[in-house]
């Protein structure tokens, strides 16, 4: 890309060339080496040790969707970080929760946020929720080379569909394959345990308060059986990140709200360590 000439004050030609409304396409055309998936890694032997984010969960309710994540990052058998943030707003009506290689995942989220903002500025309107999910799918697919070297990124995407007036959840695989989930979803190392908990507790008529409690219950169950997932840490005042997306937009629960939910669950678990029980019939 040509450097901006200070004497004339002109923008580089790349900025004046007509193209698509995708910022990723712009980078791909003019500076592809800046895209995460285009970087060449040196040859390595064995698995690359890097911090990994673990468990993300999401659940819908009649007014929207809740997306939440634990706070632990691991590196092999070690705890790399106890208070990592894994849930981020993508734009006003959507959010992304990251699992997989933490550094690459955070970089991908930042690029995704920029992609959505760039599209809105160029087109004068937001992408549909389906369109946002497709853009994220393309970004994950571009990371396939890294994934083949053990640096996979597997996010969970959720948002409020203003056209359909409901919350929706999209999951992905390492190749960028996209699936829309019904009711609830989980990704990451503790996802199998979180999904099992949500399967027994989910109802179509959940209130927002019930939905936020459900995701923390699911993360607690995941932490109970998966060492890479962190449960509520009362001593350090570290609690799951819980976000809610409705017709009013994205909102992250305050630390006080999250701690209140977590503490109420911990108190109940003193009597029922395995959590709430679903009816047999």
From Swiss-Prot:
HAMAP family: Proteasome_B_B. Its main location: cytoplasm. The formation of the proteasomal ATPase ARC-20S proteasome complex, likely via the docking of the C-termini of ARC into the intersubunit pockets in the alpha-rings, may trigger opening of the gate for substrate entry. Interconversion between the open-gate and close-gate conformations leads to a dynamic regulation of the 20S proteasome proteolysis activity. CDD domains: proteasome_protease_HslV. Residues 1-53 form a propeptide. Component of the proteasome core, a large protease complex with broad specificity involved in protein degradation. One of its GO terms (cellular component) is proteasome core complex, beta-subunit complex. NCBIfam families: 20S_bact_beta. Pfam families: Proteasome. Belongs to the peptidase T1B family. Its EC number is 3.4.25.1. It catalyses: Cleavage of peptide bonds with very broad specificity. Pathway: Protein degradation; proteasomal Pup-dependent pathway. Gene3D superfamilies: Glutamine Phosphoribosylpyrophosphate, subunit 1, domain 1. It comes from Streptomyces scabiei (strain 87.22). Keywords: Autocatalytic cleavage, Cytoplasm, Hydrolase, Protease, Proteasome, Threonine protease, Zymogen. GO terms for biological process: modification-dependent protein catabolic process; proteasomal protein catabolic process. The active site is at 54 (nucleophile). This is Proteasome subunit beta. It is found in: Cytoplasm. It comes from the Bacteria. The 20S proteasome core is composed of 14 alpha and 14 beta subunits that assemble into four stacked heptameric rings, resulting in a barrel-shaped structure. The two inner rings, each composed of seven catalytic beta subunits, are sandwiched by two outer rings, each composed of seven alpha subunits. The catalytic chamber with the active sites is on the inside of the barrel. Has a gated structure, the ends of the cylinder being occluded by the N-termini of the alpha-subunits. Is capped by the proteasome-associated ATPase, ARC. GO terms for molecular function: threonine-type endopeptidase activity.
């Amino acid at each position: 890309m040509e450097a901006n000439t200070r004497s004339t004050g002109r923008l580089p030609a790349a900025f004046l060339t007509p193209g698509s409304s995708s910022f990723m396409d712009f980078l791909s055309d003019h500076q592809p080496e800046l895209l995460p998936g285009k970087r060449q890694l040196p040859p390595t032997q064995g698995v690359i040790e890097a911090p990994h984010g673990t468990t993300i969960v999401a659940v819908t309710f009649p007014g929207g969707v809740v997306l939440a994540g634990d706070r632990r990052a691991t590196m092999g058998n070690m705890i790399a970080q106890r208070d990592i943030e894994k849930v981020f707003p993508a734009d006003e009506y959507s959010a992304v929760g990251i699992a997989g290689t933490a550094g690459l995942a955070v970089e991908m989220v930042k690029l995704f946020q920029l992609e959505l903002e760039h599209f809105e500025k160029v087109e004068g309107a937001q992408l549909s929720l389906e369109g946002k999910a497709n853009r994220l799918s393309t970004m994950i697919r571009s990371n396939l080379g890294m994934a083949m070297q053990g640096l996979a990124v597997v996010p969970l995407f959720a948002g409020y569909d203003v056209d359909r007036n409901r919350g929706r959840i999209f999951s992905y695989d390492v190749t960028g394959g996209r699936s829309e989930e019904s009711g609830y979803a989980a990704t990451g190392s503790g996802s199998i345990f979180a999904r099992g908990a949500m399967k027994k507790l989910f109802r179509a008529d959940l209130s927002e308060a019930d939905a936020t409690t459900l995701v923390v219950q699911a993360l607690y169950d995941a932490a109970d059986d998966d060492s890479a997932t962190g449960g509520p840490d009362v001593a350090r005042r570290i609690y799951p990140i819980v976000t809610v997306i409705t017709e009013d937009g994205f909102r992250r629960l305050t630390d006080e709200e999250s701690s209140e939910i977590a503490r109420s669950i911990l108190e109940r678990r003193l009597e029922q360590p395995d959590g709430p029980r679903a009816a047999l019939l």
